[in-house]
Amino acid sequence: METLSFEFAAGQPARGKALVGVVGSGDLEVLLEPGQAGKLAIQVVTSVNGAEQRWQQLFERMFREQTPPALNIDIHDFGATPGVVRLRLEQGLEEVGHD
């Protein structure tokens, strides 16, 4: 198991919380909670050692296209593909944007 941390610029804190995915379903669980204004903090606990660059590139692609709300994101990964990771993150971002 490896724990990775990432930070990105963000907007204002999100309005809500979200939990998407289940570790046993698609091998990924993502918890999103409001964070500190201007900061997106992501912590990834993964069973895949040596994948930090893959995670960094995925997040950079996602957040280059849009400015995310300020969030603390915890990801529990057991070998999910980048497509599943992006899908779950997009689902979570959609969820925290609703009242």
UniProtKB/Swiss-Prot annotation:
Positions carrying O-(phosphoribosyl dephospho-coenzyme A)serine: S25
Role noted for this protein: Subunit of malonate decarboxylase, it is an acyl carrier protein to which acetyl and malonyl thioester residues are bound via a 2'-(5''-phosphoribosyl)-3'-dephospho-CoA prosthetic group and turn over during the catalytic mechanism.
Superkingdom field: Bacteria
Cellular component per GO, a single term: cytoplasm
Main localisation: cytoplasm
Keywords: Cytoplasm, Phosphoprotein
Cellular compartments annotated: Cytoplasm
Name assigned to this protein: Malonate decarboxylase acyl carrier protein
PTM annotation: Covalently binds the prosthetic group of malonate decarboxylase.
One Pfam short name: ACP
Family matches, as NCBIfam families: malonate_delta (TIGR03130), PRK01220.1 (NF002293)
GO molecular function, one term: acyl carrier activity
Gene coding for it: mdcC
InterPro entries, sorted: Mal_deCO2ase/Cit_lyase_ACP, Malonate_deCO2ase_dsu
Family: Belongs to the MdcC family.
Keyword Cytoplasm: yes
